[in-house]
Amino acid sequence: MSTPTDPDLDTARGLIDGALVDLLAVPDAGLDAPWIWPDHGEVDRRYGFFRILEDLDAATAAIDASGAARPLDQAIVAPTTVARWELIGLLAPLTEADLDADPGGDEWTIRQTVAHIIASQHAYGAYTAWWREQAIRTSDERLPFAPDGLDDPAWDEAVAANGSLDQVRGRLHLALEGATALLSDLTSDELAFGARWSDLPVTVGFRQGRWASHITEHTVQVDKTLVWLGRQPSEAERLVRLVAAAWGRLEACVWPRPPDADALRVTVDAARRAAATAASVRAAGTA
């Protein structure tokens, strides 16, 4: 799904999505089968997963070593995309039946948990933009409370995660990209403006930093729900989750905006290699 972000990064995400699909097609029983690592020789298919992970982390290291500076507002929210892809990696092998299965004990289904993540992310954007506009230079109990209804009802939890897993993932992307577009140029002064979170006095910067931890908090909840449902991940599914997280670490170097063209090029090239390797690992099972 196209999102309000750099088109090259959108392309790279599509390549990673395809790579995850290819890797999930490898059964655990086939992980020990041979795979030819180009220009090196025969290893097993399992190592193909780790080769992708290693290459993504090497690309991350290359960008980090370049020392490209980033504005504080971007650095604060960049970890959010790591959390995003950790969640995507966890959700990747699930069926719609998994999303809607009742874990009992009045706990949320996985779909309800993800709907909360998506709706909350939209609300973070809408309400933080309001706090920014107030330009209040204090963060204590004198702060007013934000009015209700600033967020769009189209993003309510009741509908935020409707549809297929692809649609749910696309809506997560849109919620995040929409929030970053709304809050893409916060100054250091604006990050220090007063705001509220869960009615407590905080700062705009705190609310921005909360994006990543909120997604992670509920990714843990999804993990717990899968345990309650008795759904044990396969080895390949565990490895796919690691690959998705590695991509998230790399994407965090260029999201919400790349520091320079070289960093984006390194990222897109790594996504292309990941997609090619994943396709090769999958095809090795048909040889």
Task: Place the predicted regions along the sequence by residue.
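Active-site-proximal binding-pocket segments
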Residues: 124, 143-162, 179, 186, ...
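Glycine/small-residue-rich hydrophobic helix-like segments
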Residues: 167-196, 221
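A short, structured beta-strand-centered segment in the mid-to-C-terminal lobe
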Residues: 8, 12, 156-175
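Hydrophobic alpha-helical core bundles mediating ligand binding, dimerization, or RNAP-core interactions
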Residues: 80, 84-87, 91, 124, ...
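Extracellular-facing binding/remodeling surfaces
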Residues: 92-98
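Short, contiguous alpha-helical
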Residues: 1-17, 28-78, 88, 100-152, ...
